[in-house]
């Protein structure tokens, strides 16, 4: 089995977005991922849609900081985001309300 990379995760995330759970949720989320395959990615949530890209987003409401491998595990359902946060594997800066809702907006592959 080939290793899943953050590029693959972010390319697919909009297809896993559950607009029915989003309601009026909106925000710009920045991801700062370190280690092998690390880099910066973003997700914009607005009007019941999500779009993703590589690089930095303007005016992030939320920044998530993690090792790239750990984030891939979170995104693919192998690591619980709350457990990752509590153990220090996931750091959160910004809108905690958006952070708490974020994981529920995307179904797991």
Region roles according to the model:
Residues 1-109:
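Feature captures hydrophobic
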